[in-house]
């Protein structure tokens, strides 16, 4: 206690030293606490399910070119033949339109096996979960809703159980309310049974792509489970597009699967802030050395009256740990602010797709980390100065003109060099990341995103079950929008660029002679577009023509290919008139009528792949993204789009309203965030290093004032 009181008095006597040291430590500990809170929520915190270490994700991995994803037939085989698992659960998601409660609203619903909730060990807080028989087609008109849905839509009415809601014009009975914190596989408002027909799924009459999880039996390892599932997979009799020779089943912990896309980014940031803390430690250690040198007479007097070396070391360590704890307390405030900044910089729709990101908080674990980091930091930066300063030559130290030992000067120089070296590492890393990000921004998109509005329209299959109904709706909608003053061009596509592909098909290509069975049907992305799409996106036409109103059902099937497709499959040949089998019941039924420029569909970092476009009039999908090129601010046309849709169908909502520039920006959210944070951390490191060098130079000059005066 005496040491603490003495340390406080010392800090009060030297306010400049105290403030500089506490601020340096607060910055170092604060950024570490902020990033650790993210790490804790996403990577370290156990999944909030029963025995989460036994829950695994099951996926199909391509060992050669092919179509990824498990089909439902495999789920039924695994469920019936596996002995390593207690249970399995399949899940997916789909868009539904909620009506009957005000304005129609698009809802993203999870479709899950009835076994999902029991597998996770989660029960509804009100009502019941799904029953096994409710996964059968025709028996699946029940839903479980989130607590937020229950509160917002039903005012938390306990009698809401048993009532119905309308999704895609079908009535679904609400049977349960999930707990407030429940989230699987991401944030959903509604869960409904995944209705599958085992016979059709196994015999090729339909192929439903699913995601699959399982709960291992006690004592079974993931390696054993993976071996068993691969055995079942290879002997499976499922009819379909999967080639057993080019695929294998992968089993890994569910937590690992949920965070795979962000793990590396978080670890990189954690390493960067670790460097910042080391620089802060070196900085304060230098200040402590300089301060200790100025107190050498005090230490000599204390030693002369009986204080041992251990007593001096203890006093100096007490001061350094106390200083670090004060810095940690201030750093905690910085961390709270930093976490808010990080979370607010991530769009809500993105945060809802990353496990744990919505639950970042300064909880007990983070507080313990901050306290531990503060104590460890205090010992780290205080130990070397304490040991160095306790080595006393009483005769020399008691002389008023005593000079600083060369050993201590060398130690201070070492700390300065360490700060500069670590700062350079961070600056180089941030510079390389910035250069990569700038190159990403300079990548040729293949289209012009300026002044373009995008809107998603998903027609419910219950009202638009036939192709002509869908084509008529989108054709009339685009005609109305095209006639809107200020709209220069209007079109639609099944999936926007930079967001993957809506379809990947296997079909023959004229001129291709497969040498192995696996190459018999080449997997190619297929985009479904309307005639005005390429003009609205300003994608160049390189050869032939684009689609027009004559390319409809009942007329010859036509298609467009991109430049990468033509270059790969028909080099040095004219692609116009070539045949492909995309979307055809008959082999090679579709004629290529044009070649368009390459567009990046899988992301700015991915090179354009060969792809095929088919006309919506011949391939009538129910879900399309509208593209409106305008003469100015495109967001001012949102009301016009909403009105045009309502005039055609009063119960049809619009969704995902954004400019194309916003869509492009969102596609590089992660590299932008990492680059920004690394730049901030490198800037902090540079600031700390500059303060350290300044302090070192100031102290050196102050100690040599007499010498400088004589000279």
Residue positions per predicted region:
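Alpha-helical transmembrane segments of integral membrane proteins
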Residues: 1-18, 254-259, 287-314, 318, ...
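Membrane-helix entry/capping segments
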Residues: 1-20, 48-49, 61, 95, ...
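Short, strongly hydrophobic transmembrane alpha-helices
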Residues: 14-42, 279-281, 324-329, 412-436, ...
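Membrane-proximal juxtamembrane linkers immediately C-terminal to transmembrane helices
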Residues: 35-60, 82-84, 123, 184-187, ...
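Membrane-proximal extracellular/periplasmic loop immediately following the first transmembrane helix
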Residues: 47-95, 208-213, 445-506
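Mid-to-C-terminal secondary-structure elements
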Residues: 95, 109-132, 141-267, 340-345, ...
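Short coil/turn motifs that cap or connect alpha-helices
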Residues: 123, 295, 308, 393, ...
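Interfacial "coupling" helices/loops that link adjacent transmembrane helices in transporter permeases
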Residues: 280-324, 691-711
